[in-house]
């Protein structure tokens, strides 16, 4: 299930599940994450899951890379284990003054504002991870028709609560972001 386990500095290891971003690979990452949490392995300090990677930080005074690697390789992880999920509704306001990129999206994607909203709100998203800024969900599997490239020059300020569409993800900014 894990394609490669390698050092990440002297007190962490990097579990690589592949380069694709999809639910199947992300589910493997989460299964390992949950299993390691459940095992409560002495010496493991922190687990950081992402789309398709898992970083495991450990205390060098208690365990070394080879010991942690062997523990991870010997975990009995199956796809049969049901992953617990929660459905969360996130209210979104699309008034003109909150829709920072709607005109750009209409032009780039060659579809109307109503069609953008219809496609966006007509879908349930899968949360691949939270991060970048505190608690920011990376909601995946955005319809191809809604996928847009990142801005060439990032906004100087992104207000808290903004929803960004970037490539295959929708992100909800949990904090205001100011680029300096």
What is the predicted function of each stretch?
Residues 1-178:
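Glycine-rich active-site loops that engage anionic ligands at enzyme catalytic sites
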